[in-house]
Amino acid sequence: MFSHVGIVFRDLKASGDFYRQVLAQIGIRLLEDHTQPDGTGWLVFGTGNSRPFFVVAAGRPSFWTESSRPSSSPAHIAFDAPSREAVDRFHSVGLGCGAANNGDPGIRHGGSYAAFLIDLDGNNIEATYRS
């Protein structure tokens, strides 16, 4: 299991606003805002239960040592959801915030209930509920 996942985005404000609204639907909230005056920095999202957490960044956060460009290969990140209704809200709110549909809410392999979106930078994000 991982401790955290961090991804660099082109626009911290736009991506931060997007993830703040979408992740709230599945019980994940903004925990820390390290936005700098020049628009770079990072945001930490989580449930407040320590780990794992998700980092949205722009520019090069001081704790990263590699290139700060958004990836040319989109990421696929799946978030646990507390219910089917939360998956539905995640999908609906995401579409309203500018994401593209990459899979309507529904039953998937193994009996999970999931929905998929393409975020503002082309990453495939998913909300999954497993009963």
List each language-model region with its residue ranges.
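N-terminal beta-strand motif that seeds the catalytic metal site of vicinal oxygen chelate
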Residues: M1-G16, I77, S131
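Amphipathic alpha-helical segments
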Residues: K13-R29
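Vicinal oxygen chelate
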Residues: V44, H91-S131
